[in-house]
Swiss-Prot record:
GO terms for cellular component: ribonucleoprotein complex; ribosome. One of the primary rRNA binding proteins, this protein initially binds near the 5'-end of the 23S rRNA. It is important during the early stages of 50S assembly. It makes multiple contacts with different domains of the 23S rRNA in the assembled 50S subunit and ribosome. This is Large ribosomal subunit protein uL4. Part of the 50S ribosomal subunit. Pfam families: Ribosomal_L4. HAMAP family: Ribosomal_uL4_B (MF_01328_B). Keywords: Ribonucleoprotein, Ribosomal protein, RNA-binding, rRNA-binding. Residues 50-72 are annotated as: Disordered. InterPro entries: Ribosomal_uL4, Ribosomal_uL4-like, Ribosomal_uL4_dom_sf. GO terms for molecular function: rRNA binding; structural constituent of ribosome. SUPFAM superfamilies: Ribosomal protein L4 (SSF52166).
Length: 222
């Protein structure tokens, strides 16, 4: 069992969060790399498509007579040297190049990325009240104070809350979005491995971490 410090909005330690040892089972670094590559590759549309000389709309009329003009002979306006002509060796969507990652691989990669953040001290746990009722109105100054009191490096911070449709975290979300140190605000049910890998520091609510542990640890039982 691993114990993580839990902080309130004043930046003081208010308790401990228990993580099962199964959360830190060894994983393959290659699986993390494959997962991150798949996320980035699947953001592409793979829809670039150009028309060759046989596909463009054009007249079959010869541009000018074969001899006597002094110009090089031409037989078709669809040739690539003409404006509106076909493209030579242009891109074509040859096949579906999306990379598929199954659920087990995805969850294993996310679990390993979170474990690395915890082991390097880049993840802190905040009380649920920090995300729900800590602010009566959006206050960027108070959000920045919270990060400093918790000794969070103000750089590339990702806030992770529980479920998107539960609780009222709008004030905190509006407070942190104006900070250059904050990378983003997301929810445990929507988080991706790329969000975790790209963030330098993570502030996660109790509820979000409970949901992540519940969904990720079960995959280690084969």
């Amino acid at each position: 069992m691993v114990l993580l410090s839990k902080f309130d909005f004043s930046g003081k330690e208010s308790g401990k969060f228990e993580l099962p040892d199964a959360f830190f089972t060894e994983g393959k670094e290659q699986s993390v790399k494959d997962y991150l590559v798949a996320i980035q590759a699947n953001k592409r549309q793979w829809s670039a498509c150009t028309r060759g000389r046989s596909e463009v709309s054009h007249s079959t009329k010869k541009p000018f007579r074969q001899k006597g003009t002094g110009n090089a002979r031409q037989g078709c306006l669809a040739a690539p040297q003409f404006r509106g002509g076909g493209i030579v060796f242009g891109p074509k969507p040859k096949f579906d190049q999306h990379i598929r990652i199954n659920k087990k691989e995805r969850r294993a990669a996310i679990r390993l990325l979170l474990a690395q953040k915890i082991q390097t001290g880049k993840l802190i746990v905040a009380e649920n009240s920090v995300f729900v009722s800590s602010l009566d109105a959006p206050k960027t100054k108070e959000a920045l104070r919270f990060l400093k009191e918790c000794n969070v490096e103000c750089r590339g911070v990702l806030f992770v809350d529980g479920l998107a449709h539960v609780g009222s975290n709008e004030n905190l979300r509006l407070s942190v979005r104006n900070l250059s140190a904050v990378r983003g605000f997301t929810y445990g049910e929507n988080i991706s491995g790329y969000d975790i890998a790209a963030a330098r520091n993570i502030v996660v609510s109790e509820k979000a971490l409970e949901l992540l542990v519940e969904s990720l640890v079960s995959t280690t039982k084969d």
